[in-house]
């Protein structure tokens, strides 16, 4: 005896990506509001917000309201 209960059948291991596949945040768009692409002086800013620094619009990833 091999000690396996499903001998001869395909054994399915735990899906390590199951949490990612069923992430409840994916169903709630309000969670992603701070991670939208904004126009920052003609340059897309994907991870934050646009701030004027030294007279120029620059993409910032911190200090975003």
From Swiss-Prot:
Residues 1-33 are annotated as: Disordered. GO terms for cellular component: extracellular region. Residues 1-36 form a propeptide. Coiled coil: none annotated. Residues 14-26 have a biased composition (Acidic residues). The cysteine framework is VI/VII (C-C-CC-C-C). The presence of a 'disulfide through disulfide knot' structurally defines this protein as a knottin. Transmembrane segments: none annotated. The keyword Secreted applies. Keywords: Disulfide bond, Ion channel impairing toxin, Knottin, Secreted, Toxin. Expressed by the venom duct. Probable toxin that inhibits ion channels. GO terms for molecular function: ion channel regulator activity; toxin activity. It is found in: Secreted. Is not hydroxylated. The keyword Zinc-finger does not apply. This is Conotoxin Am6.4. The lineage of its organism: Eukaryota, Metazoa, Spiralia, Lophotrochozoa, Mollusca. Disulfide bonds join 40-50, 45-59, 49-64.
